Regions:
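Conserved donor-binding/catalytic core segment of Leloir-type glycosyltransferases
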Residues: 10-28, 35-38, 167
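Nucleotide-sugar-dependent
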Residues: 26-29, 77-81, 89-112, 121-133
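Short alpha-helix at the nucleotide-sugar/activated-sugar donor binding site of glycosyltransferases
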Residues: 115
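A charged, aromatic-enriched C-terminal amphipathic alpha-helix characteristic of glycosyltransferases
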Residues: 145-151, 161-191
């Protein structure tokens, strides 16, 4: 996790919201709503989307006239370079009856990486997801499940509000729950306890 922690982005007057990932499973629709919310800030922000070349070709036309810049995805070993250019890291899920059972209890592999960067995180997705509950309870991200909440979050993120405490909470959570070596120790101890009590 230490490799994901880096210097804060230098203020440029424009807040860079960064999303790195696929646009399938209707995620592009949620990202479009985020871009529309950013547009309402009158030039104070831009959404940088890092995704596959095929996804760019397939979905870019849906983002016309919106403050969005598309970039080709980078290999995972270089993803930290993308994160460090961000002012805000974006994660989104969509309400889908078809995929509801899958997403309800899942946590994207990007979440621990986002938490470790100590940068503000914007989550936009359904409230009934365990991920929503997890991030909200630990006070590590700005959360929105509806357009009105989303606009409020975006407005706060492009303002001069200080999110230092939230970002430090995120880093602590990453180290507590998402460190591979620590989790290996916890698993070993759990197995040892079971064996001793059997």
């Amino acid at each position: 996790l230490s490799k994901f922690k880096g210097p804060a982005s230098k203020p440029t007057g424009i807040t860079h919201f960064v999303y790195a990932g696929g646009l399938h499973l209707d995620r592009w629709k949620a990202l479009k709503e985020i871009a529309e919310a950013i547009k309402e800030t009158d030039g104070k922000g831009i959404l940088d989307i890092f995704t596959s070349k095929d996804s760019i070709e397939l979905y870019h036309s849906n983002f016309k006239m919106l403050p969005v810049a598309f970039h080709e995805a980078v290999p995972h070993e270089h993803i930290n370079e993308v994160y460090q250019k961000a002012d805000v890291l974006v994660h989104t899920e969509v309400q889908s009856e078809k995929m509801k059972g899958f997403f309800k209890y899942s946590i994207s592999t990007k979440i621990p990486e986002y938490l470790a960067t100590e940068k503000p995180i914007l989550f936009y997705g359904p409230q009934d997801m365990k991920l929503f509950e997890y991030l909200l309870q630990n006070r590590v991200a700005l959360m929105a499940s509806a357009k009105e909440e989303l606009q409020c979050c975006v407005n706060r993120l492009v303002s001069d509000e200080d999110f230092t405490e939230m970002c430090k909470n995120a880093r602590c959570l990453a180290e507590k729950n998402h460190c591979a070596s620590e989790n290996q120790i916890k698993l070993y101890n759990a197995i040892e306890t079971v064996l001793l009590n059997s």
